[in-house]
C-alpha cells in the first residue's frame, strides 16, 4: 500500500498550517522553521492549496486525481464534492470517530483488520463509506487499551454528520458532511483550478 512517509510536523511547517491536528505540530514555526513567506505566483498558490488538501487526508497524488475527476463529473460544486469524497474515506471516518489519534493510526487500524463496516471487516483505507453505514471496532480489538483510550477520551467530538455510540464502540455516518463542517483550512476552489487545465 502506497503511503505518505514524510514526518508529520515537518510537513505542517512546510505547508504553513497544522494538517495533522497535533498541538505541537507548529511549535517551532515561530523560530523560522515554517515555510518561506516569499510571494508565490498564482500557480504556486494553487499548488500549495493542493498540497495542503492532500496532506490533510494523506492521499497520494495518483489517487487524489481520481477523486478530482469524480468530483468534476458530479452535479454539485466540484470543490464541495471533492471534500465530501475525502471526508467519507473509511480511514478518515475512523479518525473522525475517535478510534485513531491520527489519520495514520486510523489507516493502520483499517489495514490490520481492526475495523468493521456494517459488521464486516474492511481493510481498504480508501473504502467509500455510505450514509447509514456503521463503523465499529472488532470485538477482539476492544481489548486494546490504546484503541479504547483513544475512543473514550475524545471528549471534543463535534462532527454533526457522525453519530458516535460509546457503549457499542461504533459510529455511523448519518448524512453527508457539509463543506463548512470539514475541519480543514483549504481553498478548495484553488485546488480545482490547479487541475482544471490538466484533467
Swiss-Prot record:
It comes from the Bacteria. The keyword Ribonucleoprotein applies. SUPFAM superfamilies: Alpha-L RNA-binding motif. One of its GO terms (cellular component) is small ribosomal subunit. Residues 88-151 form the S4 RNA-binding domain. Pfam families: Ribosomal_S4, S4. The keyword Ribonucleoprotein applies. SMART domains: Ribosomal_S4, S4. InterPro entries: Ribosomal_uS4, Ribosomal_uS4_bac-type, Ribosomal_uS4_CS, Ribosomal_uS4_N, S4_RNA-bd, S4_RNA-bd_sf. Keywords: Ribonucleoprotein, Ribosomal protein, RNA-binding, rRNA-binding. GO terms for molecular function: rRNA binding; structural constituent of ribosome. CDD domains: S4. GO terms for biological process: ribosomal small subunit biogenesis; translation. HAMAP family: Ribosomal_uS4_B. Part of the 30S ribosomal subunit. Contacts protein S5. The interaction surface between S4 and S5 is involved in control of translational fidelity. PANTHER family: 30S 40S RIBOSOMAL PROTEIN, SMALL RIBOSOMAL SUBUNIT PROTEIN US4M. Belongs to the universal ribosomal protein uS4 family. NCBIfam families: PRK05327.1, rpsD_bact. One of the primary rRNA binding proteins, it binds directly to 16S rRNA where it nucleates assembly of the body of the 30S subunit. This is Small ribosomal subunit protein uS4B. It comes from Alkaliphilus metalliredigens (strain QYMF).
Amino acid at each position: 500500500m502506497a503511503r505518505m512517509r514524510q514526518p508529520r510536523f515537518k510537513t505542517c511547517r512546510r505547508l504553513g498550517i497544522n494538517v495533522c491536528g497535533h498541538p505541537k505540530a507548529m511549535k517551532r514555526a515561530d523560530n523560522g522553521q515554517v515555510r518561506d513567506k516569499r510571494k508565490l505566483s498564482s500557480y504556486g498558490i494553487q499548488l500549495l492549496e493542493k498540497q495542503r488538501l492532500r496532506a490533510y487526508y494523506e492521499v497520494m497524488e495518483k489517487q487524489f486525481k481520481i477523486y478530482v475527476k469524480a468530483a468534476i463529473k458530479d452535479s454539485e460544486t466540484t470543490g464541495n464534492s471533492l471534500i465530501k469524497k475525502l471526508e467519507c474515506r473509511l480511514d478518515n471516518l475512523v479518525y473522525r470517530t475517535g478510534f485513531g489519534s491520527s489519520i495514520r493510526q486510523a489507516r493502520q487500524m483499517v489495514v490490520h483488520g481492526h475495523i468493521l463496516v456494517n459488521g464486516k471487516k474492511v481493510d481498504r483505507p480508501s473504502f467509500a463509506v455510505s450514509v447509514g453505514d456503521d463503523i465499529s471496532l472488532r470485538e477482539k480489538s476492544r481489548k486494546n487499551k490504546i484503541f479504547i483510550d483513544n475512543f473514550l477520551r475524545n471528549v471534543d467530538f463535534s462532527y454533526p454528520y457522525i453519530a458516535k455510540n460509546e457503549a457499542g464502540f461504533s459510529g455511523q455516518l448519518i448524512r453527508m458532511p457539509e463543506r463548512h463542517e470539514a475541519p480543514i483550512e483549504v481553498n478548495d476552489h484553488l485546488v480545482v483550478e490547479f487541475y482544471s487545465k490538466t484533467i
